[in-house]
């Protein structure tokens, strides 16, 4: 989750004289998901919030996760980034060239984040393995209401073989939102508070029901 291309996209795109519209497609096989940044591992930051989830999913099922949008990012024309990483335990088929037995992938809903775009690995290529890692970032102001979220939809489908009915595929999901320290130092606190309120409302609803 702490991997990125850094300055390689700009530098290699220039050095290799790649067409602007082809840079990501040409560099993805070469760079993959980029270089791991050890400084981001095991350390918290007030301008970044990380959420970890996971579970088991069956064919044609969808699981939706909602990462609260921090109000301190609203209507600010400043750099912001969403990073989403999905890994799953795919059953394998050794007798076929297309050995991945199932496909689990995520899509995201751009509530208030239409100004942020995928910036690194090519979106079709990232779905070819069992690890999908995408960075969505931008600098234009986001417009959203209190309580809005960055929604991530995890889905499952057949690939090289037909999954048996109710056959479960295990997966793990990590999502984060961040901005520069000079823009906001309350991202972590805002997301934590929103998640706590959501959990409290969920419990209250179950008790009343």
Where are these regions (language model features)?
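Surface-exposed beta-strand/loop patches in noncatalytic accessory domains
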Residues: 93-135
